[in-house]
């Protein structure tokens, strides 16, 4: 697919990432379920009552051009993503596998830290669709503002969910020629 982009300042680009899909068959999931409340048994038993896990043990699923599940926790840096990421990525309810994000939303509701497991790639330092999916899920659940900054290990992106389409703004650099 082709995405529209505009230049913002010297190094930033603003990209229209399109609309999020929330229907179970568009993510896709293997069976009909509430995509805002997806529970996986081993996640629940592994993390229930752990100090870095706040709230419920459910994930929020959506598709931003690829499937994502987002877990909101008090400290995403404490999650062993290398252990849990591949188990969730390949879980039976995800016929096309899934990107896995653990996210921590700041008290000001404007900043979100993430720890991402990208399907087929493993732990990643940054992922644009994960940033968009996380910001949209946080906003839909009333955890974050409509505009937020998503922080990865190696950088940040500004995400705007104020319209049906999601807009991502951040620096662009050449990685490989």
Identify the function of each model-found stretch.
Residues 1-124, 136-177:
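Active-site proximal loop and beta-alpha junction motif in alpha/beta enzyme cores
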Residues 129-137:
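Short amphipathic alpha-helical face segments that pack within enzyme cores
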């Amino acid at each position: 697919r082709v995405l529209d982009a505009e230049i913002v300042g010297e190094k930033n680009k603003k990209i229209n990432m399109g609309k999020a899909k929330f229907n179970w068959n568009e993510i896709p999931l293997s069976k009909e379920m509430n995509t805002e409340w997806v529970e996986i048994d081993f996640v629940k038993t592994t993390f229930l009552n752990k100090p870095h896990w706040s709230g419920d043990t459910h994930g929020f699923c959506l598709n931003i051009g690829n499937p994502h599940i987002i877990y909101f926790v008090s400290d995403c840096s404490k999650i062993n993503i290398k252990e849990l990421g591949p188990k969730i990525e390949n879980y039976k309810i995800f016929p096309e596998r899934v990107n896995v994000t653990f996210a921590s939303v700041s008290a000001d509701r404007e900043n979100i830290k993430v720890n991402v497991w990208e399907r087929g790639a493993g732990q990643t330092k940054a992922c644009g669709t994960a940033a968009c999916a996380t910001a949209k899920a946080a906003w839909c659940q009333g955890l974050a503002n409509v505009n937020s900054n998503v922080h990865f290990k190696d950088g940040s992106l500004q995400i705007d969910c104020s319209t049906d389409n999601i807009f991502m703004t951040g620096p662009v650099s050449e990685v490989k020629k």
